Structure formats: C-alpha cells, structure tokens
Amino acid sequence: ASSIRAGHTLIVLSDKNIVADKVPANAIMVTGAVHHYLIAQGIRTDANLIIETGLARDSHQVAVLIGFGATCVYPYLAYDVIDDLVASGELLGDPIQARVNFRKGLDKGLLKILSKMGISTIVSYRGAQLFEAVGLSEEVVNLCFKGVQSRIKGATFADLAADQAILAANAFKRRAPLDQGGLLKFVFNKEYHAFNPDVINSLHTAVRTGDYDNYRHYADLVNSRPVATLRALLQLKTDNSID
C-alpha cells in the first residue's frame, strides 16, 4: 500500500519462479485477496494488477481472473506449451503465429463470456465478480472473494492448501510424464464423468436394439452412479401426493 501511495502503479503477481520445496498459492485466490485489500485501503484505482500465471489456459480461467480484479493476464505456461509443440513438430507453422492464434482464441472466448452477461467492454467486466462460489467456506470467500454468494459452503484454506501441495509434488516428480488428468475428457481412474463410456455405450445399445433388458442395464448404470452434481443430491418425494 505504501508503494502505491508513493507513486508505483504496477503490481505483478507471479507463480512462475516456483521451487520444489514451496507450494504456490492459487492465482485466482491471490488476485481476489489483493484486489479486495486494495479496495479496503482505498487505492485500488491507483494500481494495476498484472497476473503472470500458469493456471490460466483457457478463456474461462482468464475471465475468472479478470472478474476478480486482474488488470491483465499473462498465461506464460500456455505460451511455453505452444513453443514446445512447435519445436517437437506436433504443431506446424510459425511459433509466433501460433501464439497469436491462441491469443485470438482467448479474446473470442472472453467476448462470448462477456456478451452472455450483456457486457461489451473488458473494463466493465473487471472486478465485477459475476460468479457464485460452489463449495468454498466462508473464510475463503471473505478474504479472497468478498461479496460472492457461497450457499453450500465447503472447502477451507487447509483443504485448498492440501490440493495445492499434491499438485506441487506431482510437478517435481523426476522422469515422470505430466499427468493430463481427466477434467475435460474421460480418463480411466481420474475425475469421474457422469457421461462416461459405459453409460454412453449402454445407451447406444439400448437405442439400437430396442431391447428392454438393454435399457434396464443403461438405467441401472445411471441410477447407481455416484454423486457428481448438486442436482444428484435432490430426491423427489414420491410418497406424498400434492393432489
């Protein structure tokens, strides 16, 4: 705060120079916490938050950072991956043009996100916090995402720190390939997907054959799958008629 009052206008928050024995903080949480601290000090408009992070890889992640106060985002890891893909021959063409294409994709994705909220300029989206937290405790919300709804509460700083520690430990495993995870695409023994290959294959079989037993197999897979969404926690009161 004293540096900003002295005339400095750029604050760079970076997770680039991480080391093996340190656990990096989540860039979104850090951005939100610093943003709200500057607001509380009455100097937020006197400084710009530059976020240099490997966390931001798609337009949604960039939108979240900007929505919680980032002035601009530099996704260094995404650019490093692009350079590596070009160098290894997996991505053809000029590396600079590949970066430009990636940036263009981010821009279009951001515009789509903004337009859904009726916003046409990034300055109107910055710090708007047009989000609702799912699964974050009050202590996290009050420090990092003040004013955001978190109806079901959830993970504490200790929980989130444990997750970060796992990621940090995996990042520094020697001679081990990077774990791609299963967030976007089904990967065996990774994150659960409600529409996994077993469910889809059984649905196709039931539709193509028209056999009731095949349909029952599909229905049993759907009805017995673990809780993966909030709506899966709801249950209809079928024993009480409303008539």
Question: Where do the protein language model's features map onto the residues?
Answer:
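Conserved helix-loop functional segments at active or binding sites
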Residues: S2-L10, K16, H36-I43
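Structural preference for beta-strand elements that scaffold enzyme active sites
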Residues: L10-V12, D46-I50, C72
